[in-house]
A protein has these predicted regions:
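Hydrophobic, helix-forming membrane-interacting segments
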Residues: 2-30
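A domain-level signal for caspase-like cysteine endopeptidase catalytic cores
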Residues: 26-90, 98
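Short acidic, S/G/P-rich loop/turn micro-motifs used as interaction or catalytic elements
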Residues: 48-51, 88-94, 121-124, 147-149
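Conserved strand-to-helix beginnings and helix N-cap segments that scaffold or border functional pockets
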Residues: 52, 96-100, 127, 152-155
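A short acidic, amphipathic alpha-helical/loop segment
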Residues: 54, 58, 106, 125-132
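Structured loop/turn residues at beta-strand edges in well-structured enzyme cores
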Residues: 78, 110, 136
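A short, glycine/acidic-enriched catalytic loop
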Residues: 88-110
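Active-site-proximal C-terminal subdomain of hydrolase catalytic domains
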Residues: 113-202
């Protein structure tokens, strides 16, 4: 318990972390981590040609972190550990052209521990999708602004740390401390919800 308190105190000094991040760290320290030795990346394009370019960018920049990469353009949800979704989010939070209405249901369909909506969507639509139902078995990253190549730079750093044994919340806290003075300028504008099991790629 004392080591946990020390860790949280140290983090609080560095930056004022959101309560969700602090809870994620507590959950990790008390429940351990799940190791995925050969992680599989799924890329699900629900917007056809609208998102082909950024999907290809992400595959080229991030594919080497994974044992296998599966691309789906026909609406079928690929089975994978990490699912990147390229789609428009409707004002009510539903996923346009999706076989499932919510991002949590998409994650469950893939069996993924992490789902990233990798296409930019309006902030109010992102807030709406967070409220939609579904199993909370995967952490979610919802993108508001990719910031050009900043998106790939950011996730390269995240996945590098995860391969070194850091969980997603710990990697996120290291790469993007929640304070304007230390937040990287290139970092994409996102909403991160640490849910489900915390995994490492090792």
């Amino acid at each position: 318990v004392s080591s946990l308190i020390d860790d949280l105190t140290a983090l609080a000094v560095v930056a004022p972390f959101p309560l969700a991040i602090l809870f994620a760290i507590y959950k990790f320290r008390t429940s351990g981590r799940v190791r995925i030795a050969r992680p599989k990346l799924g890329l699900l394009n629900l917007g056809d040609a609208d998102f082909t370019a950024i999907l290809n960018e992400d595959r080229a920049a991030l594919g080497s972190f994974f044992e296998d990469v599966v691309v789906s353009t026909d609406g079928r949800i690929p089975r994978c550990d990490v699912l990147f979704v390229y789609a428009s989010i409707a004002p009510d939070g539903s996923v346009v052209n999706s076989p499932q209405s919510s991002v949590r249901q998409l994650a469950a369909g893939a069996g993924a521990s992490l789902l990233v909506v990798a296409s930019s969507n309006p902030g109010e639509h992102v807030v709406a999708t967070v409220k939609n139902p579904g199993p909370r078995n995967a952490s979610l990253v919802l993108t508001i602004d990719r910031k050009g190549d900043g998106f790939c730079r950011f996730f390269q750093k995240i996945f590098t740390l995860m391969k070194a044994g850091k969980t997603m919340p710990m990697a996120w806290a290291k790469v993007a401390p929640q304070h304007e003075s230390v937040m990287p300028k290139y970092a994409p504008e996102t909403v991160f919800l640490p849910e489900g099991k915390f995994v490492v790629f090792k």
